[in-house]
């Protein structure tokens, strides 16, 4: 059993190595998800890159954070889609309606909705990209490289 555990740990380390070698120190990411565990996991993974990570529990809270933030505070938003109070599509539309740079903030859907039509809907509603949950570390790294 120990051998299997060691092998799994080594595989996990190799899987995360590329992501952990990335350096996004000084970058700030907002993670929006109504599930606390999902937020915690995303924060842990993203902090491995040196990025500062903030969270919001729904779309309305995310819009409020972006709205009152100093210009350029956030570099990227990862947005869940299905949330109470305000869903990810509504939150994206609200952020897109903000003046200046805030309205152009990169927003990437981070959702279990992973069919081709979900990806297209995210783009049609103003999101810049899409990544499916559970997170694929290589795809996450590609998204970070694209937007940070």
Model-derived regions: residue spans:
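Receiver (REC) domain active-site loop signature in two-component systems and cognate sites
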Residues: 83-86, 95, 127
